[in-house]
Amino acid sequence: MNIVGQIKEKMKEEIRQAAVRAGLASADELPDVLLEVPRDKAHGDYSTNIAMQLARIAKKPPRAIAEAIVGQLDRERMSVARIEIAGPGFINFYMDNRYLTAVVPAILQAGQAYGESNVGNGEKVQVEFVSANPTGDLHLGHARGAAVGDSLCNILAKAGFDVTREYYINDAGKQIYNLAKSVEARYFQALGVDMPLPEDGYYGDDIVEIGKKLAEEYGDRFVEMEEEERLAFFRDYGLRYELEKIKKDLADFRVPFDVWYSETSLYESGKIDEALSTLRERGYIYEQDGATWFRSTAFGDDKDRVLIKQDGTYTYLLPDIAYHQDKLRRGFKKLINIWGADHHGYIPRMKAAIAALGYDPEALEVEIIQMVNLYQNGERVKMSKRTGKAVTMRELMEEVGVDAVRYFFAMRSGDTHLDFDMDLAVSQSNENPVYYVQYAHARVSSILRQAEEQHISYDGDLALHHLVETEKEIELLKVLGDFPDVVAEAALKRMPHRVTAYAFDLASALHSFYNAEKVLDLDNIEKTKARLALVKAVQITLQNALALIGVSAPEQM
């Protein structure tokens, strides 16, 4: 049960009814009532600008409208202690904090389900993320996309969406041919034959390793084999090796997928031809200069796009169009793609393709993930000390730990550049946000253990009577009560960093409460049991928040 959400809905409904009772507008004319939390606590717990919104309809000054609304409000029904009109007509509400007493029992009853809502209404959403080429190690951009994507999936599911997590395997096209040729070169080199890597080949240590494994496992079996047959084997072997490595890295990063979708399957199933036929039937395909073109300018793209080149090979766009047609045919109402910043220009042509196929282009949402810069000892880390190459996701996980990487990567909006301070990420200090938040969980766990050792249990019913007496209790209760709304907002606005910020705010409120108040007071067992219930509610909520962003909640540190 979302106590704070229910109160806010009651307040909005009461404001709507008050406006109608005051004769300012009919129910049909009323705009949505917005309740904001003022930055300055002196301006109340909530504020609305409804008077300004109604000025045009009511044909009155906003301040006069505000006075008319306030005169019609039922404070008791709204759990409001007092109301003030400020500035040009803002209505500020100061809450009667007694409503907060129900927050703790609600959290204790809900447990792991606290924070769930049905704002998604079971809508089928597909989130496609990471989708790195299976030709080498996952890098930091992939890691950030994985952290943001997985957190978003968790949050969407918590908010009542039916979520499918999907990884698109780019296992067709030129890059896979280059993978096979690179494996071939490394295989022959492992046998002592000097074969150069192709110009567009892959130079990673993993390809060297694949070549050695093939030489050890099969000896010179492939030397006399026809090149086409040999490359087909090396392609499959290399793909399998790289995919297994990617899957292992993502599993260790706590990022699961429901579907691993092969690009090759689009060719084998005829889905590429189907997409091309659909576009042709709808009049968006034409031939020019020996190539096949998609008339994407009909949907606002800056130029038409080639789908089939003069030599008969496909551009990247055609299988991507077929893939998105397949997604929509599977019944997804929203397609959320999490792409690197280098794909920004690709968005208009994909939306154009979806529209040309006969679907709503707004079904596609693209979240852009910006670059990550690593810093250590105050200097930017450009290359791995161990390999002399770009730092991989695996190396960063091993260097600073999964919790730190997941938290830091989910801490900012994905479309902003991120500077990752490796020294800060491993420091045991309050300046390290992941340490600060996890320490809050360890602290409440320690309090609950101490209480158990003294045979004192928490009591949610006592929380109804003993928990709105001090400023720090009230602040902590307010933050606890906000969690379901934060999750719902993070889901609807696709902002996983809102949950990370919430976890930090809750930890901060807990530390402030702990420093100001005594929890275990043997001279006042009733208050102790009530405060233990509050501490238990913090533990549950912190666990739930951290689980959404893939971070552990340690009981001891």
From Swiss-Prot:
It is found in: Cytoplasm. SMART domains: Arg_tRNA_synt_N, DALR_1. The keyword rRNA processing does not apply. Pfam families: Arg_tRNA_synt_N, DALR_1, tRNA-synt_1d. GO terms for biological process: arginyl-tRNA aminoacylation. PROSITE patterns: AA_TRNA_LIGASE_I. Coiled coil: none annotated. A motif ('HIGH' region) lies at residues 132-142. GO terms for molecular function: arginine-tRNA ligase activity; ATP binding. It comes from the Bacteria. It catalyses: tRNA(Arg) + L-arginine + ATP = L-arginyl-tRNA(Arg) + AMP + diphosphate. Its EC number is 6.1.1.19. InterPro entries: aa-tRNA-synth_I_CS (IPR001412), Arg-tRNA-ligase (IPR001278), Arg-tRNA-synth_N (IPR005148), Arg-tRNA-synth_N_sf (IPR036695), ArgRS_core (IPR035684), DALR_anticod-bd (IPR008909), Rossmann-like_a/b/a_fold (IPR014729), tRNAsynth_Ia_anticodon-bd (IPR009080). It is an enzyme of class 6 (ligase). Belongs to the class-I aminoacyl-tRNA synthetase family. Monomer. This is Arginine--tRNA ligase. It comes from Geobacillus kaustophilus (strain HTA426).
